[in-house]
Swiss-Prot record:
UniProt keyword annotation of Lipid biosynthesis present: no
Region Disordered, annotated ranges: 180-222, 414-499
Cellular location(s): Cytoplasm; Nucleus
Keywords: Coiled coil, Cytoplasm, Nucleus, Toxin
Outcome when changing K247A: Abolishes poison activity
UniProt keyword Nucleus present: yes
A biological process term (GO) from this entry: meiotic drive
Domain of life assignment: Eukaryota
Protein name: Meiotic driver SPOK1
Coiled-coil regions listed in the entry: 4-41
InterPro entries found in the cross-reference section: Kinase-like_dom_sf
Regions of compositional bias (Basic and acidic residues) in chain numbering: 457-468
GO cellular component term of the entry, any: nucleus
Length: 734
């Protein structure tokens, strides 16, 4: 080989070596990039990264069915409050949202606090696999794509001490769908003292500790939104911060949202069109009018919930948009609305769209939640006072506000069309008189005859509302008459508010002594108020006590009476109240329920009578049943009418209480020996009482009565009892 050829070969080999080196470098760079990508995909994300991922992979994953295959029907709003005016919520857009977005961004900074991008992508894949054509599908989407991320961000704020205090960021959760706010129910009411021989025999053979776990359904108001934002208070209570409702995406058409919500008299126009049964001949105008009607009805439904649940904040979630709502309690007739349309506001993703992340659904709903935390929900007397004002100033669908001029179409564009005509508006035009409103709230001169929605079966899946708003508002009006005339307004009513119970609960020994006619309990924290004329005896007997409580609540259901926790202390048939009898200072609890559940309270009273000699030790002291003439108002415009009076049993045992199950079995055996099968194994029904150093059992509305067991049978069921002297060391959860 010549020198020339050898040189050429060496040059080729050198080039090949260089190429191999370059390939190796490129391969290493690619592997490094892939490794970094995987690390980025699987590491936790920053606040802004999380917003970007939620919008890109979750919000954009929503796929809607063709409208022809979507659920049909209207939102049921007849008899519900609706506002006179609709105005832009500019304070949220210009002040509140920028402030809270900057706050969250400052607190989170560049810390990697949120789920990895891979997790968000995987969830987005699941979302995109399902077409959304009805409210149930929107429900699932909103939970996964919006509510879950919002809750994750608020959880970070709640753990930030400075922000938690300054901006009132509590522990928070979106409620489950209130129509499904249940534990499973086996369908047994428990109100019958008798049971079949076979069932009774099986229960007696099994004993008190071997029956199947009870499944119970929790009571909910008939006026139920799809969800409630629940905030947990430091003391353990729970209050509502806002109300929300889901709507199928085609019910809140995004192409009409901005124009519809910009109309100050939207509600008046829609109500007038429906009442007059006027249709435009123009098909395009018909579609716009139908879209406006659906939007107005969706807003009305949430507005009514906001009023009756005592909150100033609410929103409509419809997949492609959120309608964020606010009501100023100084102006009930105006609803403020901020339409959130992320697809338009954020736009298509680019390499750097950080400046638009504040417009994502998650970011805006976080700011909405923080805004709502600054406002307290109305409850009890303040709620009734506010609802009396609302009842006097607001109209209900389909009544008209007399002083609003109808800004409708020109006569040439309108035609009077029968509701049987095959047009869009016929779906929500009246054919019949409204049902459920049998008492007028206002004079007939102020109310125009109203067209209403048909009472057929063409309703939304989740819009079934079996309440009778007329009946509830009639009670509200009657309550105001019973209070008598007031020379002032709402502020005066609040200033004259009835005193709430403030004292510690009386002891079991105190209230048992009252019931049995024995001496005062010197260990009761309220004994100084019980003692009259230096006597060691109770100043009243049990019968007089119950009568005095009845008379006190007859004057006002809020005098010395306060609901303990509407969301946390609700059971299968009622709510817990704290009461104080003036001037004797007796402080105890009441189990309140609605008018149609009296039989279950009476059944529970019979169970307590069977357990008479166990009262104050194994079960609370039962002090009778009273009726509240006016009723204690609840969120959702329900009224507690009956109340069973009892001693306070205690608190839920802490997780560290090792012998809780043993103590529970002892108490169950004790009531079983008296012929009572508790029938409800819910953990909340077994409370640690530090005074008696044992587990006390409550809630006997599902209990079954049977003949008491003979002593020999009792001894077989009983186990050796342990000394209770050292049980006071157990901690309770406060």
């Amino acid at each position: 080989m010549s020198d020339k050829d050898r040189i050429a070969q060496l040059l080729r080999e050198l080039e090949e070596a260089k190429a191999r080196v370059e390939e190796a470098k490129a391969r290493e760079a690619q592997e490094r990039c892939e490794k970094e990508r995987l690390q980025l995909e699987h590491r936790k994300t920053t606040f802004l990264e999380y917003l970007r991922n939620c919008h890109r992979h979750l919000y954009n994953a929503l796929r809607l069915t063709d409208t022809s295959r979507s659920s049909t029907g209207y939102t049921k709003v007849v008899g519900k409050y609706y506002p006179k005016r609709l105005r832009p919520w500019t304070n949220f857009a210009n002040v509140l949202h920028p402030r809270y977005f900057d706050l969250v961004q400052k607190i989170c900074g560049q810390r990697q606090l949120f789920e990895p991008a891979s997790t968000t992508k995987n969830l987005g894949t699941i979302i995109s696999d399902h077409l959304a054509g009805n409210e149930k599908a929107i429900d699932r989407f909103e939970v996964d794509a919006v509510e879950r991320p919002v809750q994750a961000i608020l959880k970070v704020l709640a753990t930030h001490e400075e922000a938690g205090k300054a901006y009132r960021c509590p522990e928070f959760r979106f409620s489950a769908n209130l129509r499904e706010l249940t534990q499973e129910d086996d369908g047994s009411s428990g109100a019958d003292d008798n049971t079949s021989d076979g069932s009774l025999e099986r229960r007696q053979q099994a004993g008190p500790n071997k029956r199947p776990t009870s499944k119970r359904k929790y009571i909910c108001s008939n006026r139920q939104p799809d969800g409630v934002g629940i905030r947990m208070q430091p003391g353990g209570g729970q209050t509502q911060a806002f109300i929300y409702d889901y709507k199928a995406a085609h019910k809140v058409a995004i192409e009409h949202v901005r124009s519809a919500t910009a109309k100050e008299h939207l509600f008046h126009e829609v109500v007038a069109r429906i009442n007059d049964n006027k249709l435009s001949r123009d098909k395009e105008v018909q579609r716009r009018e139908q879209a406006e009607a659906f939007i107005a009805m969706a807003l009305t439904q949430v507005f009514d919930y906001m009023i009756t649940y005592g909150v100033s904040y609410g929103y409509v979630a419809a997949g492609r948009c959120l309608l964020l709502l606010y009501v100023d309690r100084d102006d009930w007739q105006t609803l403020y609305c901020h339409p959130c349309l992320p697809a338009d506001d954020v736009g298509e993703p680019t390499n750097d769209w950080t400046d638009r992340l504040s417009h994502t659904a998650v970011a805006q709903l976080v700011s909405f939640c923080l805004s709502s935390f600054q406002s307290e929900a109305l409850e009890g007397q303040s709620l009734e006072t506010a609802l009396s004002v609302a009842n006097a100033t607001l109209k209900t669908w389909s009544e008209s506000y007399a002083d609003v001029a109808y800004l409708g179409l020109e006569p040439a564009e309108l035609s009077s069309a029968p509701s049987s005509q095959n047009t869009d508006i016929s779906e929500y035009t009246s054919k019949a008189k409204p049902t459920g409103r049998n008492v007028a709230l206002r004079s007939q001169s102020s109310c125009k005859p109203a067209a209403v929605l048909p009472q057929g079966n063409e309703h939304d899946e989740h819009d079934e509302d079996h309440s009778e708003p007329g009946a509830s508002r009639s009670r509200l009006a009657a309550n105001k008459r019973k209070r008598g005339p007031s020379s002032g307004g709402e502020d005066e009513d609040i200033a004259m508010a009835d005193p709430e119970p403030t004292r510690q609960y009386c002891t079991q020994a105190c209230l048992l002594g009252l019931k049995r006619g024995k001496d005062l309990d010197e260990n009761c924290p309220n004994v100084s108020l019980h003692r009259f004329d230096g006597s060691s005896r109770h100043p009243v007997n049990a019968h007089r006590f119950t009568d005095m409580v009845k008379q006190q609540l007859l004057l006002s259901p809020y005098k010395g009476c306060r609901m303990v926790d509407f969301w946390g202390k609700r059971g299968a048939m009622g709510w817990l109240f704290k009461l104080e009898l003036f001037p004797y200072g007796y402080t105890f609890v009441g189990k309140g329920t609605l008018e149609d559940r009296l039989s279950r309270l009476e059944h529970e009273g019979r169970v307590y009578a069977r357990l008479d000699h166990l009262q104050g030790d194994v079960v609370p002291v039962h002090l009778g049943l009273v009726r509240l003439d006016r009723g204690y108002i609840l969120p959702g415009l329900e009224f507690v009418v009956y109340m069973m009076l009892m001693s306070w049993a205690g608190q839920t045992p802490s997780a560290s209480m090792a012998d809780a199950e043993t103590l529970k079995r002892e108490s169950l055996t004790a009531i079983w020996s008296e012929g009572v099968d508790h029938g409800d194994d819910n953990r909340a029904n077994y409370l640690w009482n530090a005074e008696r150093c044992r587990i006390m059992i409550i809630d006997f509305d599902r209990a079954r009565l049977f003949p008491p067991l003979k002593p020999r049978a009792v001894s077989r069921l009983s186990k050796p009892k342990r000394e209770r002297g050292n049980r006071s060391r157990h901690q309770i959860r406060t």
